[in-house]
A protein has these predicted regions:
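OB-fold ssDNA-binding interfaces and closely related basic DNA-contact patches used
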Residues: 1-135, 203
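Alpha-helix initiation and N-capping motif
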Residues: 3, 180, 202, 238-242
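Intrinsic-disorder/low-complexity linker and hinge segments
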Residues: 14-21, 217-240
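Short low-polarity hydrophobic stretches
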Residues: 70, 147-148, 245
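Short acidic, low-complexity intrinsically disordered linear motifs used
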Residues: 74, 233-251
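Compact mixed alphabeta submodule
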Residues: 107-229
Length: 251
């Protein structure tokens, strides 16, 4: 028995369980949340991470999130400069996409503690615009911040290709919670986001890329060609890349 392999798999399962319980995803309809100050970076509650999606049916955290080299990103950028349309489309699939996270509590579910909400570019820009507005300012302030209404509409409900998330920052100022002990617990008992997403080494990501490019299959060439054609077709259909990534990331 390969004990190291067993330990690695156990760690993967524990990481997945830990992530699930510490992430929040809006459900269809309206919910109210509060964005909290982030314990591990009190100057900025928003955490920008980059991910490779859909490689070998998995999502991988890119080291470029932390300013470190990433072989998949390097390969994607080389493909972009090849002048070949199919390789350019493959590069778009391979390159890392940004997803922003913020620590939040959900109104009515405060007992569940702090969770991380991950959202796309549109929601991120709206939140930054509100905070930059002097009439609103720091919406995360423990005493005079503001709650945020989040509305999630499924693709079926909207008749669009992708689900839609919209936000409205409430005008009334209010504390995160009234109880001081509960407030302290919410501000101090926060995970570091890097505990939820495992960063693979340069060598491990190289193996991921090689597996994606050269799947262990008798029909390797046919499968790779099909993947490239699929990427081209999908890219032609996608008008809102951010919305598309939101849908894929949340599956």
């Amino acid at each position: 028995m390969d004990i190291n392999s067993i330990r690695k798999r156990l760690n993967q399962l524990q990481t997945t369980n830990n992530r699930t319980s510490n992430l929040w995803k809006p459900q269809p309809g309206k919910q109210v949340i509060r964005v909290l100050p982030y314990k591990h970076n009190k100057d900025n509650p928003f955490i920008e991470l980059f991910f490779h999606f859909g490689l070998n049916n998995k999502t991988y955290l890119s080291p470029i999130s932390f300013g470190r080299p990433d072989p998949i990103e390097e390969f994607a950028q080389k493909l972009k400069t090849s002048g070949n349309r199919e390789e350019y489309q493959m590069a778009r699939k391979l390159e890392a996409k940004m997803r922003t996270f913020a620590p939040v509590i959900v109104r009515g579910e405060e007992a569940q503690g702090v969770r991380f909400w991950g959202f796309g570019k549109t929601v991120y820009q709206e939140l930054l615009s509100v905070i930059a507005d002097p009439d609103y300012g720091d919406i995360t302030d423990a005493v005079s911040g503001r709650d945020v209404s989040v509305e999630f509409i499924t693709a079926e409900e909207s008749g669009a290709s992708f689900p839609k998330t919209s936000i409205r920052v409430r005008p009334n100022q209010n504390p995160i919670v009234e109880d001081k002990a509960q407030l302290e617990a919410l501000l101090e008992n926060q995970k570091d986001i890097t505990e939820l997403y495992q960063e693979l080494s340069y060598e491990e990501l190289t193996d991921v890329l090689n597996t994606w490019l050269n799947p262990d299959d008798a029909s390797t060439d046919e499968k790779t060609e099909t993947e490239v054609s699929s990427v081209v077709a999908e890219s032609a259909k996608v008008e809102d890349a951010s919305a598309a990534f939101d849908e894929l990331f949340n599956k």
